[in-house]
Amino acid sequence: MALNLRKNHPILKIINDSLVDLPTPSNISAWWNFGSLLGICLMTQIITGLLLAMHYTADTTLAFSSVAHMCRNVQFGWLIRNLHANGASFFFICIYLHIGRGFYYGSYLNKETWNIGVILPPTLMATAFVGYVLPWGQMSFWGATVITNLFSAIPYIGQTLVEWAWGGFSVDNPTLTRFFALHFLLLFVTVGLTLVHLTFLHETGSNNPLGIPSDCDKIPFHPYYSIKDMLGFALMLILLATMALFSPNLLGDPENFTPANPLVTPPHIKPEWYFLFAYAILRSIPNKLGGVLALAASVLVLFLVPLLHKSKQRSMTFRPLLPFLFWTLVANLLILTWVGSQPVEHPFIIIGQVASFTYFTXILVLFPIASVLENKMLNL
């Protein structure tokens, strides 16, 4: 009998077990497409980022000009830059939807997969933040100044830490060069974590919309889900291309078309849209250290989700109260995102404070209480 290379070759076997013969639940919906879409986003960012790095100069006097040169004189440089900038937005859209799906369907009960997954968004946020500084526009410079300054809230070592991160007494050339190095380095951290995430996922297998064991009804990943994923890739890449070609600056800040000037502060310093919910939580607490802790907690609170699962059912599909609370949380996050983009004045301050309080209360208090109530209602 001929040797099946796909199943016996040490390297091809790993690929085969992950993408071809992987036993997959037969009923997973389009919400399960976002994992593979994140993989495509990562590949797109690596390719476009590498091409941009070939033309970029990490120096305060040349960075802005090198980006302008890229868009004017490099073959399709404008397109590569637009794909990279908007690709980051699509990356965050996909990761937020992916987390939301895991939250709704109880995928967080695969604890190892979930915990590695929760480390990924902060890594991605750090990567996007240092990347945003590289074009050295006004918002790049002032965003870097404001966010790195948050580390000074750490007692005793804060100020030293900030000056060490800056490589001087303000954001300047050493900061830019190290941020370029970090942007490149964090990419590999992201890739490594992604592989660990996938390894843990394939240990347990995928969850499904019903939240019940699916061992009795599994189908091979290829051709069923490989085709389904390809449809997802096509749709997302069409959307990304449309955005990059028709409205590339829709999500950017006009302030970043002005070269960085330490002597002129922009009227509203705000990060990219995908950080606004966390930025709103940071701003809603008047104390600096408290704000920084709340900012960290806004993402790291996801580590507690498996511990707060009190329901006898895994998924929210058939639960009477939880879907309502879940969509309230989604609306709350949208309100936080909107508030983060507004100036710090009445009524936005109080709206941000209420929304921040509701965000943590919903996850830490209301979800567990509602789960216990449901168990009582359904006599479980």
UniProtKB/Swiss-Prot annotation:
The cytochrome bc1 complex contains 11 subunits: 3 respiratory subunits (MT-CYB, CYC1 and UQCRFS1), 2 core proteins (UQCRC1 and UQCRC2) and 6 low-molecular weight proteins (UQCRH/QCR6, UQCRB/QCR7, UQCRQ/QCR8, UQCR10/QCR9, UQCR11/QCR10 and a cleavage product of UQCRFS1). This cytochrome bc1 complex then forms a dimer. PANTHER family: CYTOCHROME B (PTHR19271:SF16). It comes from the Eukaryota. Heme 1 (or BL or b562) is low-potential and absorbs at about 562 nm, and heme 2 (or BH or b566) is high-potential and absorbs at about 566 nm. One of its GO terms (molecular function) is ubiquinol-cytochrome-c reductase activity. This is Cytochrome b. GO terms for cellular component: mitochondrial inner membrane; respiratory chain complex III. It is found in: Mitochondrion inner membrane. The chain crosses the membrane at residues 34-54, 78-99, 114-134, 179-199, 227-247, 289-309, 321-341, 348-368. Belongs to the cytochrome b family. Heme b b562 binds at residues 84, 183. Keywords: Electron transport, Heme, Iron, Membrane, Metal-binding, Mitochondrion, Mitochondrion inner membrane, Respiratory chain, Transmembrane, Transmembrane helix, Transport, Ubiquinone. It comes from Gymnorhina tibicen. Binds 2 heme b groups non-covalently.
